């Protein structure tokens, strides 16, 4: 992602192209907004530079924020259904992953990015997560018609698979909220190999 940003800025500065796209012309009427990290506290914990919250359950590698809430389970898109699934799987309080909080948008990071999207009225979003080489594009009946084609074009450009999120990963995420709320295309791109 950082390499892409560097290439994009260099192409714009030099009046060049990137992937056969004239960047200067493309950015005349379009904007590209990049939020490099929505969860800096969680990253610090995952890297061992900070301690997890005192009452958090031990276990999986750390994916949650500093409060032990998994931000990709905290958005108001099927949150109640997701919360029941979390409880059935034993995620009942703060921990390293899959606990969506006491209510949707309970976390400052969730509220910040949702408010930012509403204020800026984005046409689409791309959320980059780590591991899986997969692209998710749908959220039930709210999925815009052109989303599948857009996901297939993305997949063809990078060799990833277009997939459907399952079970506990099928609600409460940023992409889900954006599609549900804005009625526009949203994508989660699982970059890199491996599993969470």
Model regions: which residues?
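Active-site/substrate-binding loop(s) of hydrolase catalytic cores
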Residues: 1-144, 152
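Catalytic cores of processing enzymes, dominated by hydrolases/peptidases
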Residues: 102-103, 134-196
